Structures are given as C-alpha cells and as structure tokens.
C-alpha cells in the first residue's frame, strides 16, 4: 500500500463501508453486489488481455465471446433479478461496452412495455437467452432526435396480412444502432405505419434481419457496420436498408395501437404510452452519468494523493498535488456532483418504477412530468458528467492522456450519451415545453404539482421580467434548505423570463413555431435551472435520511459545496433576480474555498466509498494500493510495439542512415 494513501484512509472522519451501504441501498445489496463481482473476477472464463493493445476486430471478437459467456454464467449462477443482471453485465466487460447491450437495454424493455402477452411469450425468453439477439433501430442517417421526420415505412398488405418494410431514400437507412452491424439477428424497427392509404405515424415492429443458424442477411435486407468511431470499438454500430422486406402482421408491437387483419387501425388510449422505453432508458442514463463521473473522480483523486510535485514552500518536500487549492477546486466540486447524481439516479429509478406501476393500472397523470424530468435530467447530468470526466483527465496531467489512466476510455464510452437517446439540447427543449405548459396553467389560475409546484408561488400580477427583483428572501449559505430555496427562486425566475419572452415573440411573429425557435436559448436556460434545482433539492432531502452522524456531516459538506459552487458559476442569475446580494456572492466564493479545506481529509475515503474494484476502474493511476509508477512501467512494457527490440518498420529508415 502506498504510504500516502494509507495515511489518507487513516485520517478519514467516517467509515466508507457505511457510505457504500447507503449508495447501494442497503448492506445486503452491497454484500450481494460484491458476491456477483467476485463470481466474475475470480472466473478464468472472464479473463482477457488488455483491450487497449488489441485491434478493433480483436476487441469486437473478445466482446462477443464474453457476452456469450455472460449469458451462460447468468443461467449457471441463477441471476434473474434486474439489478443483479445489471451488475453482472457491467462487470463482465469491465470498462468497455458490449455488442449485445441493446438487446437488454432497449429490445427487451420495448417488448415488455409495448408487446402483447402473446408477443412476449413468443420472443421474450429467446431474447433473454440470445437465441434472438435484438437491437433497436430508430435513428436514421438523415434523422435522429426528430422522430416525426423518420422516413422508413411499414405498409400493410391485407391480402397476405403482412407489413412491407422499405427504406425509400438514402437518408432513411437506419444508422447507428448498436449491435446491428454484425451481431443482431432481429431489430425493433421504428417505421411510419401506412394502412388503407393513410399514414398513422411511428410504430414499432419486430423485424428478423438475419437467418438464425447461418446468420446471413435475409432477402431484402442490406446490413453492415458503419466503421470506426470516436470510441465504442467493441460495438458494431450498424446500418440497415430494407427493400420490400415482409413481416407478419403479428410482428407489430400491439399492446396499445393495433392493425386488424383487414387493415383497420385501432389507435392507442394515449400516444404517451409509447414513451415507455425512452423514459426507461433516460432515467437509467442519469445513474450512468453518476457512475462514469464517480469513476473519473476516483482515479483523479487517488492519483492526486499519490503524485508529488513542485513546492508550496521553498526547500520543503514536494507536496501531494491534492494539497494544492487549485487541484481541490478542479476535483472536489466534481466529487460533490458525483454524489449528487448518485442520489438523483436512485430517485429517478424509484420514480420510474412507481409511475410505471400506475401506468399499468391506467393512471397516466404523472407521465408528462416523468417524461419532462427524464429528458431534462438526462441532458443535465450527461453534459455535466461529460465535462467533468475530461476535467479529471486533465487534472492528472500528462499521464491522464495515456490509456493506462482509464480516463480516455471512460470519456469516449460516456460521451455518446450526450447525443444518443435524444440530443441534449432537444431534450432540454422538451422539458421546456412542459415548463411552459405548467406556467400557462398557473397563469390561468390552476395549481400544478410535483417538481414544478414552485411555479404556484409566482405572483400573478407580475408582468415584466425586470420586475422579478422582488423575491422576499434572505439566503443562509450554510443551510442546504435555504440554498434549495434560492435555486427554486432562480428556476421560477428563468421559467417566467422564458415564458414572457415567448409570449412577446408570439405577438410579434404571429407564429408559435418561429417564436419558439427565437426564444429557444431562454427556454434551454430555464430547463437547466429547473434541473439544477431538482438536483440540489434531492441532495438536500437525502441528508435528512442519513442516520450516521459522521456520514451526514461529510455529505452535508458535499451538498453545500455542490450548491455553492453552482451559485458561484451562475452568479449573474442570482444577482439579477435579487435572490442574493453582491456581498453574499463574495461570501459564497469564500465559503467554497473553506469547504475545499474541510473535504480535503475525507477525499480519498469518499471515492473509496464508491467501491470500484481495480479491474472495474481499468486504471493504473487510480489503483486502490496507489502503486502507480511501478505498474505504469509494467503496463508500457506490454505495448505490442515492444515485442521486438527492433521494429520491422526500421527498414524504411535504414536506407537513410546507410549514407552516414
């Protein structure tokens, strides 16, 4: 054990194990998660060479092999609980992504949410066992987040009771679905449903694309890999072109909308019911943002405790770089953010399951807010985590640029989440639509509930945005509850400003659509403020549920740091709204620095509580034992370029040197 890390752990003010239990949900869940981790880490079938030193084709082959092993092992170990399946899947490929991932994260959830009982009986068991390997083909070359623009068609033929699928243009070719290129044999395809000469919009169809047994593409199917990407080397993101490809009528997912044998269309009870899969995945992505940022913080903070550099006082030993205030200022707000997102991710998961149960009983009342909240928080957390991971990499100096740090892999595998499952700016604008509807409800004298209930407090007589400067508040910068109130006022103010500016543009432009576009910057800012408020609120409320006094104290410091750092970065919003005064902002900036000092002695223990095993981090710099330099040298020796003393390419240089 590196002596610096031992000293850091010995000086912690709390027991990291107890905090791990809180993050997992209970001591029993921690025990079971570790049990599953050890099943994998101690199983020779799951061992493989360092993927960093393999070609893309080799990495893909390793990933497919391990995915097949994963399914067999889950059967062998009797793992069926959804949480346990998730833990197992995360660990079997460690820091990398899997070609069959969309089978479990999109294909099966969509089948569960939108399939009839008969459809689930037909496909569910086979897809869980990978006899059917599914993907989710929504995005096209020409359209992504704008779903109504998708061009793929599914035209019903009543004579044969089949749908005929076509990709009528080059831009209609399905593009990007993970596992589509070489792995999947089925896809849930989103296509424009046409029956009796009328288009009824997007619907989901289960489409066989490869022959089971030979894995060759079926007639009418052109399918392949889209080529190298920024990351995701282990996944065969693919393209799919369909030419008069026929599927049975029963392959349309018909839990809600239906097409009768004669071609009659039966519309769903509510169009919102088809949001199910998107809402599920977006709520899941909030937790993924927390996990990715937590990993990056673990690596950067441990390394900063091991790394000694420069001088604070001339002539004294080189200090740990974690002792520099600038390093603390880079990393500790991100650590606080990681904890905030952990708690928000758990809240979103619980909320999704609760509301989904209500939907199953016909209660759709909370679905609009859930849709808005998952869209906004997906964007807010992924943008923040994405920036934070890169900040952690740069905080590790030159070594952070090496793949041995693990940080480049974390970054390239996380950054797609800013654009997949809804491009983030568009997600923020979806949240803004809900905020504007809620504002209009309040303005018309109705009350709103849920996370937007703060809009009920808006005085109805206030018309001009500049008149917002009448908030009756005195913010206590040492009170999480008071800071939550400040964020609430900021959100209300920015929602109202966006609403008033939108109203002005509607009056001036006569077109709601043009007005919306010309107000979209204000609308995104309103959504960001709303999401920021939600995160602060949930973090603050979590403190009240913590029993252990030492853990509550350190989490309170993190909550204050998260909230105050956010104010310091958005001081203009709090000043313009007269939510806070200039002297208070000065106090905020000073308090942030005090909190850095307070958190310093617990920083390593706080990342230890995330409980990432070394193999999960995949980082030489973030090793639990802190023995960075010895292992850095050993890692470099394994580079394929070092297999021969003289590389074969020397022949190109030799002729130039023969003249010397």
Swiss-Prot record:
It is found in: Peroxisome. Its main location: other. A motif (Microbody targeting signal) lies at residues 658-660. Transmembrane segments: none annotated. It catalyses: a 2,3-saturated acyl-CoA + O2 = a (2E)-enoyl-CoA + H2O2; tetracosanoyl-CoA + O2 = (2E)-tetracosenoyl-CoA + H2O2; glutaryl-CoA + O2 = (2E)-glutaconyl-CoA + H2O2; hexanoyl-CoA + O2 = (2E)-hexenoyl-CoA + H2O2. SUPFAM superfamilies: Acyl-CoA dehydrogenase C-terminal domain-like, Acyl-CoA dehydrogenase NM domain-like. It is an enzyme of class 1 (oxidoreductase). The record marks 468-469 as: Cleavage. Pathway: Lipid metabolism; peroxisomal fatty acid beta-oxidation. Changing residue 237 to S: In MITCH; gain-of-function; increased dimerization; increased protein levels and peroxisomal acyl-coenzyme A oxidase function; increased levels of reactive oxygen species; no effect on VLCFA levels; no effect on peroxisome location; causes Schwann cell death and myelination defects. InterPro entries: ACO, ACOX_C_alpha1, Acyl-CoA_ox_N, Acyl-CoA_Oxase/DH_mid-dom, Acyl-CoA_Oxase/DH_mid-dom_sf, Acyl-CoA_oxidase, Acyl-CoA_oxidase_C, AcylCo_DH-like_C. Widely expressed with highest levels of isoform 1 and isoform 2 detected in testis. Isoform 1 is expressed at higher levels than isoform 2 in liver and kidney while isoform 2 levels are higher in brain, lung, muscle, white adipose tissue and testis. Levels are almost equal in heart. Isoform 1 and isoform 2 can reverse the Acox1 null phenotype in mouse which is characterized by severe microvesicular hepatic steatosis, sustained activation of PPARA, spontaneous massive peroxisome proliferation and eventual development of hepatocellular carcinomas. Isoform 2 is more effective in reversal of the phenotype than isoform 1. It is linked to Adrenoleukodystrophy, pseudoneonatal: A peroxisomal single-enzyme disorder of fatty acid beta-oxidation, resulting in clinical manifestations that remind neonatal adrenoleukodystrophy. Clinical features include intellectual disability, leukodystrophy, seizures, mild hepatomegaly, hearing deficit. Pseudo-NALD is characterized by increased plasma levels of very-long chain fatty acids, due to decreased or absent peroxisome acyl-CoA oxidase activity. Peroxisomes are intact and functioning. Mitchell syndrome: A disorder characterized by episodic demyelination, sensorimotor polyneuropathy, and sensorineural hearing loss. This is Peroxisomal acyl-coenzyme A oxidase 1. The gene is ACOX1.
């Amino acid at each position: 054990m590196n002596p610096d890390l031992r000293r850091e752990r010995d000086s912690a003010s709390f027991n990291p194990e107890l905090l791990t239990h809180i993050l997992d949900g209970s001591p029993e869940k921690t025990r079971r998660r570790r049990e599953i981790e050890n099943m994998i880490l101690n199983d020779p079938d799951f061992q493989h060479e360092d993927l960093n030193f393999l070609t893309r084709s080799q990495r893909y082959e390793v990933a497919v092999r391990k995915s097949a092993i994963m399914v067999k092992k889950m059967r062998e170990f009797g793992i069926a609980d959804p949480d346990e399946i998730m833990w197992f899947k995360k660990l079997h490929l460690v820091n990398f992504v899997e070609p069959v991932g969309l089978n479990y994260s999109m294909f099966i959830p969509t089948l569960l949410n939108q399939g009839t009982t008969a459809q689930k009986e037909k496909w569910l068991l086979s897809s869980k066992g990978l006899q059917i390997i599914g993907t989710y083909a929504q995005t096209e070359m020409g359209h992504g987040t704008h779903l109504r623009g998708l061009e793929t068609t599914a035209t019903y033929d009543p004579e044969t009771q089949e749908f005929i699928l076509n990709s009528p243009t080059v831009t209609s070719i399905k593009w990007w679905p993970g596992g589509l290129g070489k792995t999947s044999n089925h896809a849930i395809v989103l296509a424009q449903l046409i029956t009796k000469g009328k288009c009824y919009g997007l619907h989901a169809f289960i489409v066989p694309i490869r022959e089971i047994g030979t894995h060759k593409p079926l007639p009418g199917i052109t399918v392949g890999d889209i080529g190298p990407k920024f990351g995701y080397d282990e996944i065969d993101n693919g393209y799919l072109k369909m030419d008069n490809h026929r599927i049975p009528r029963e392959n349309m997912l018909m839990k809600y909308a239906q097409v009768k044998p004669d071609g009659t269309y039966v519309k769903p009870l509510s169009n919102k019911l088809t949001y199910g899969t998107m809402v599920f995945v977006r709520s899941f992505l909030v937790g993924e943002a927390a996990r990715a940022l937590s990993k990056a913080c673990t690596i950067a903070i441990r390394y900063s405790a091991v790394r000694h550099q420069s001088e604070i006082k001339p002539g004294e030993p080189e200090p740990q770089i974690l002792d520099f205030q600038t390093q603390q200022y880079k990393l500790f707000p991100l650590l606080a953010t990681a904890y905030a997102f952990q708690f928000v991710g758990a809240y979103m998961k619980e909320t999704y399951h609760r509301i989904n149960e209500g939907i199953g009983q016909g209660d759709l009342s909370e679905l609009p807010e859930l849709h808005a909240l998952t869209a906004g928080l997906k964007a807010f957390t992924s943008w923040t985590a994405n920036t934070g991971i890169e900040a952690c990499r740069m905080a590790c100096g030159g070594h952070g640029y090496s793949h041995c740090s693990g940080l480049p892999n974390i970054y390239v595998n996380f950054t797609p989440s800013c654009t997949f499952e809804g491009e983030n700016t568009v997600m923020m604008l979806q949240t803004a639509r809900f905020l504007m509807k809620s504002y209009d409800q309040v303005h018309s004298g109705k009350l709103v509930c849920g996370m937007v209930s703060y809009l009920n407090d808006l005085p109805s007589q206030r018309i001009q945005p500049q008149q917002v400067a009448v908030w009756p508040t005195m913010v206590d910068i040492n009170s999480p509850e008071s800071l939550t109130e400040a964020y609430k006022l900021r959100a209300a103010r920015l929602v109202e400003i966006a609403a008033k500016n939108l109203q002005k543009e509607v009056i001036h432009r006569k077109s709601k659509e043009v007005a919306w576009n010309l107000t979209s910057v204000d609308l995104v800012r309103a959504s960001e403020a709303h999401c920021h408020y939600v995160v602060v609120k949930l973090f603050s409320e979590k403190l009240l549920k913590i029993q252990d006094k030492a853990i509550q104290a350190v989490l309170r410091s993190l909550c204050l740091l998260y909230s105050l750092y956010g104010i310091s970065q958005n001081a203009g919003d709090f000043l313009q709204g007269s939510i806070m005064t200039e002297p208070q902002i000065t106090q905020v900036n000073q308090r942030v620095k005090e909190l850095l000092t307070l958190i310093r002695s617990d920083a390593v223990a706080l990342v230890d509580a995330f409980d990432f095993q070394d193999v999960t981090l995949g980082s030489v710099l973030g090793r639990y034992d802190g023995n960075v330099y010895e292992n850095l040298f050993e890692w470099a020796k394994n580079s394929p370029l070092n297999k021969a003393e003289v590389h074969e390419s020397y022949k190109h240089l030799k002729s130039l040197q023969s003249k010397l």
